[in-house]
Structures are given as C-alpha cells and as structure tokens.
Amino acid sequence: VAVSYTDGEGSPESVTSDATSAVTNVSHSPSGGVTITGIPTEDQVLTADTTTLADEDGLGALSYQWSRDGSPIDGATSDNYSLTQEDVGAAITVEVSYTDGEGASESVTSAATSQVANVNDPPAGGVTISGTATEDQVLTADTTTLADEDVLGVLNYQWSRDGSPIDGATSSTYTLEQADVGTAITVAVSYTDGEGTAESVTSDATSAVTNVSHSPTGGVTITGTATEDEVLTADTSTL
C-alpha cells in the first residue's frame, strides 16, 4: 500500500509498504446448478440443463453421470440420457462435475425426476406350430422365441380350427382329430406382462389337416338258420 501526503514545507511525500506474500484463493462453491428437462417416460430423452451453472473460480470441462434411484448407470455419461425399461418405476438424477479454474474439484446434482412411467412394449418373436398337420398327430406350440421387454407372464393357450376356438384345447399341445381334417389349425398364446398389460400372439395357420384312413370297427354277422329254404340276413348293426 502507498501512503502519500504533503509535508509542512509543502513538499509531496509518499511511502510504500513491503508486498504481502501471494494472495491465496478461497474456493467458491458453484452457483446455479443443473436441472433435468424432458418427460420421465420410457423411451424419452432427458437432458442435463446447465445454463444457470456458474463458478467464480471459472467453470472447467463438464462431466456427467446419470443415476437410477441413486445408483450410477453404466455408460450414462453424456449430457442426455434415453430412458429404458430398467428405469421404469425409478427416479433419475444427473451429477455434473468439473475442475474449476483454481484446480478445485466441484460437482452439483440435479433434483430427482418423478418415477419413470412405463410404455407398453409389444411382444417380440412369437409362437410357431411344430408337428405334422395330419389326423392323430400331435401339434406343439413353440414359444422359444417369444419375449417381452415388460417381462413375460404365465402363458395361456387356445387352439383354433379355421379361426374358431376348439373347446378344451388350452394346453401347449393339441392332438388332431377327425373334426380337424380339411381345416387349418392355429394357436393363440396370451399372457399378462410384468406391467399389467394383456398381450397375445397368434401362430401362422397350418396347412389343411390331412385324413388318416381308419379300419372299420365292429363288423357284420349273419342271422337266420342255416337250413335249406331259410333266409339269411347280413347284420351290420355293429359296423
């Protein structure tokens, strides 16, 4: 500091102090912050808005980490985040970190979103029919490719003949009978997914069911007396 004055004889005078040591910085906390914009619904994109974020010590390069119910989400380190099925029912936050102009590490965390809402995901894959479309053969509903992002529930089956449900045909297999000959068979698989939505898929139809020839049952008997002039009759009542 310099002190100056005019002495009693009218001469201007001044004296200057010794210099202090270098002034040390006091780290300033960030002001403003980060907010999340976007709709917290599956498949929507959330964005970290840092327009109000400031630091008297200078902002550095910003890094991002999104979290689900407080747990960091692997790989979610950009300024936006696309919500997935895993986020449904969870609250999302984002932390923004940086090194300020004085070398101090700083971070701010957004307020949490409301719980992420589900969007129904249609079934993937489907159901196919394995087996031969011939009378007396067994058809099987193959669901090995069936999947649902919302989680599969218990599977229910309904077999149909030319589009009409077959009474009692509600298992994963169906044995073809005479009534099926000449018709096309399908199977519908239904379930309630993990989010409570009723879903169903239907197989492609088989070719027309072919007939298998059956040997006759019962037979023919002769009634009457085997005597000259008597009449014999062919009895086919059991045929």
Cite the ranges covered by each PLM segment.
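Ser/Thr/Pro/Gly-rich low-complexity disordered regions
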Residues: 1-239
